[in-house]
């Protein structure tokens, strides 16, 4: 399912899905391949890419390049999330909540790959609705971006961290 590679610049790369697609033209069908990949540094940075080409390796390469270009930063709390969060993209809905040390990544399919490369080690999660990998990845990354650390909340409100954590 999700194949993993380690890059020289310490980015973890995972291949989530490869799909054969076709374009119908007057003379018949033109086959090509799509690839969905996620890339992360294991420390709160994650991105995804979707590539399409006539050959599988070229599609994977394009997807990896796009993933490296589209990385976002996620606020993590010692390998888990700061608070429960929901994400949605198209028909896919995801829910993630922080978990105690030793719980592990409880997630399925495309969501697991995103969480692992982002550096989340303990989380409880569930995907509802459509389990289309592209939509699940987009919903998961969207939800992770919505996670706010106490420092971010305090700065936005103009208060100290101690005053908001009471």
Swiss-Prot record:
Q: Where is the S5 DRBM domain?
A: 11-74
Tell me which domain of life the UniProt entry assigns to the organism this sequence originates from. Bacteria
SUPFAM superfamilies assigned: dsRNA-binding domain-like (SSF54768), Ribosomal protein S5 domain 2-like (SSF54211)
Care to name a GO molecular-function term for this sequence?
A: structural constituent of ribosome
Q: Which Pfam families match?
A: Ribosomal_S5, Ribosomal_S5_C
Please verify whether the record's keywords include rRNA-binding: yes
What's this protein's function? With S4 and S12 plays an important role in translational accuracy. Located at the back of the 30S subunit body where it stabilizes the conformation of the head with respect to the body.
Tell me what this protein is called. Answer: Small ribosomal subunit protein uS5
- What is the organism field in this record? Vibrio atlanticus (strain LGP32)
Q: What gene is this protein a product of? A: rpsE
């Amino acid at each position: 399912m999700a194949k993993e590679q380690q890059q020289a610049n310490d980015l973890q790369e995972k291949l989530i899905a490869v799909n054969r697609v076709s374009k119908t033209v007057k003379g018949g069908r033109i086959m090509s391949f799509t690839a969905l990949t996620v890339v992360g540094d294991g420390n709160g940075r994650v991105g995804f890419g979707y590539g399409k080409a006539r050959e599988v390796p070229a599609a994977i390469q394009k997807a990896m390049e796009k993933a490296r270009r589209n990385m976002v930063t996620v606020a993590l709390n010692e390998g888990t999330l700061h608070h429960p969060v929901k994400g949605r993209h198209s028909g896919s809905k995801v829910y993630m909540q922080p978990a105690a040390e030793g719980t592990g990544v409880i997630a399925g399919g495309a969501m697991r790959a995103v969480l692992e490369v982002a550096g989340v080690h303990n989380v409880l999660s569930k995907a509802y609705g459509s389990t289309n990998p592209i939509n699940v990845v987009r919903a998961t990354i969207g939800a992770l971006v919505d996670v706010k650390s106490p420092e971010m909340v305090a700065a936005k409100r103009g208060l100290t961290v101690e005053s908001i954590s009471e």
